[in-house]
A protein has these predicted regions:
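Acidic, Mg2+-coordinating phosphoryl-transfer loop and its flanking beta/alpha structural elements
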Residues: 104-106, 239-274
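Acidic beta-strand-to-loop metal/phosphate-binding motif
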Residues: 74-78, 184-188, 242-248
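Substrate-recognition "cap/lid" segment bordering the active-site pocket of phosphatases
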Residues: 194-241
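PRPP-associated nucleotide enzymes
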Residues: 1-143, 149-172, 192-195, 199, ...
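Substrate-recognition element of Asp-dependent hydrolases with the DxDx(T/V) motif
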Residues: 176-198, 212
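Short active-site oxyanion
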Residues: 23-27, 182-185, 240-243
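Residue-level recognition of beta-strand->loop/alpha-helix junctions
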Residues: 53, 105, 187, 212-215
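Conserved beta-strand scaffold positions in the cores of enzyme catalytic domains, especially
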Residues: 49-51, 101-103, 211, 244, ...
């Protein structure tokens, strides 16, 4: 499994930009996944940017190098190409426009390079992109930690297993909120805090299949058990789950090693066991 971070994407875009032709007057995004690469390329070259709908309507944004009335060649960009469905849909929508249109994708499934005019790197599946891991296929099949992933971790003084902790459960700042239903939430929060946890999840519209909490009756009992990562790994062994997203580097490595499956660590932004 391959993991591409924002940082790696930006590095790849800088390299790709050097190879792309210089006679491109504007860059067009295939929403939403094409928004990042297309806008980065447009900003780098200081040329006009638009979306597929915008191109049809003749609406462009930004860019001082090319006036809107002198746009002759447009690069339509997506972050990746697998089946080519999005590219085909864009071609159909843009067919007939009185302008030269070329197509590109940063990452392309090997063998499908012919579907675009320009591509940067062949990339087989499975692969995960940082910018959409919480918004599609992988989230649907993932186990997610709560503290450190969905919301911030409690600081020391908040973690008193009492009134301060209950305030934290109500007011925890969100971090990564998925836009699709996730397979399971697997947390070391105690089972007795389920009502507060479910209330917070409803507040931020987090949709999930299961909420699996720690069975210990107290913080001290959970510490004595010392099975923070072990229990997560045992749950993750279920073949229904294809990815675990964990905040703690130490736990992420243990979960991956025990379950023999990939774990994405949000603290380090690395994929272990991929």
């Amino acid at each position: 499994m391959i993991y591409i971070s924002y940082q790696e994407l930006l590095s790849d875009l800088a390299s790709w930009d050097e190879d792309l032709p210089r006679d491109i007057d504007a860059v067009c995004s295939i929403p939403r996944s094409g928004n990042i690469p297309s806008s980065v390329l447009a900003l780098s070259r200081n040329i006009q940017w638009t979306t597929v709908d915008g191109l049809v309507a003749g609406v462009f944004m930004g860019g001082q190098r090319n006036p809107k009335d002198k746009i002759n060649r447009v690069l339509v960009v997506d972050d990746s190409l697998l089946s080519g469905k999005a590219i085909k849909a864009s071609r159909k929508q843009l067919d007939g426009l009185d302008i030269e249109i070329v197509y590109g994708a940063v990452y392309v499934k090997p063998g499908n390079e012919y579907m675009v005019d320009y591509s940067y790197k062949p990339m087989a599946t499975p692969r995960i992109f940082e910018w959409n891991v919480f918004h599609g296929y992988w989230a649907n099949r993932a186990c997610l930690d709560i503290d450190g992933v969905l919301c911030r971790d409690p600081v020391g003084w908040e973690n008193d297993d009492g009134p301060k902790y209950e305030v934290f459960l109500k007011t925890a700042t969100p971090r990564f909120i998925p836009s699709v239903k996730v397979a399971a939430l697997v947390t070391n929060r105690l089972e007795r805090y389920r009502p507060q946890t479910e209330r917070w999840l409803r507040q931020y519209n987090v949709d999930y299949g299961k909420l699996i909490m720690h069975p210990a009756r107290s913080k001290e009992e959970r510490i004595r058990a010392g099975n923070h990562a072990v229990r997560k790994a045992e749950i993750y062994k279920d073949p229904a789950y294809e990815l675990f997203i964990e905040s703690s580097e130490r736990q992420a490595k243990t979960i991956s090693k025990m379950a023999r499956k990939p774990v994405l660590c949000t603290d380090t932004n690395e994929l272990y066991g991929g």
